[in-house]
A protein has these predicted regions:
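Gly/Pro/Ser/Thr-rich low-complexity, intrinsically disordered segments predominantly at protein N-termini
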Residues: 1-185
Length: 185
């Protein structure tokens, strides 16, 4: 008789208890995906440079209009807390003090992909669509392309657009246009 192997799924609360107990460290590069603790890829220079460019661009142009969050957790549901490379949140004067980040407050989620493109296109895209994130970007550092996903419906994004380094993309919710040559350098 075959016995099915069961995995223990961790909730977001379990995940934080593991950190408080010292089993995982707040400095560990991990995230909670489908109840599993997933080790993230190490930083590399092209990835870091692109994140820094995006951060500078958004922070300088969107002060008072949006909150720029760099590599901090985003609680999507009870079993998923990824750590996107960058999130733009609706502006609030209190910066959501005392609250976990929630998908309904996010305007844009960005993953910068240098070595994780398949994962970002698959698992992450599905998670963000199911959570109702209005706009998701995958910044493909290697090929200097931006994949833009919008209109989350029934667990998937209805619209996909591929943009090149010479293109611009408008964030309609913020009335702001990003020149991709500034992102890719």
């Amino acid at each position: 008789m075959a016995v099915a192997v069961k995995k223990k799924k961790f909730t977001v609360d379990d995940y934080y208890l593991l950190a408080e107990a010292g089993i995982i460290s707040y400095d560990d590069r991990v995230e909670l995906i489908h109840g599993e603790i997933i080790e993230m890829s190490p930083h590399n220079p092209p990835h870091s440079v692109c994140i820094n460019r995006l951060n500078m661009l958004f922070a300088s142009q969107l002060a008072g209009k949006a909150i720029v969050s760099v590599q901090l957790s985003l609680t999507l549901d009870n079993y998923n807390e990824p750590e996107p490379d960058l999130v733009l949140y609706k502006h609030r004067d209190d910066f959501y003090k005392g609250e976990k980040s929630k998908p309904e407050n996010a305007l844009l989620v960005i993953e910068v992909a240098n070595t994780t493109i398949k994962y970002d296109r698959g698992v992450k895209r599905e998670l963000y669509a199911k959570a109702g994130i209005p706009e998701y970007w995958i910044v493909d550092v290697k090929n200097q392309l931006l994949e833009r996903y919008t209109v989350p419906e029934k667990g998937q994004f209805e619209q996909k657009e591929i943009l090149e380094k010479e293109d611009s993309v408008k964030l309609s919710q913020l009335n702001f246009t990003v020149e991709l040559k500034k992102v890719f350098g």
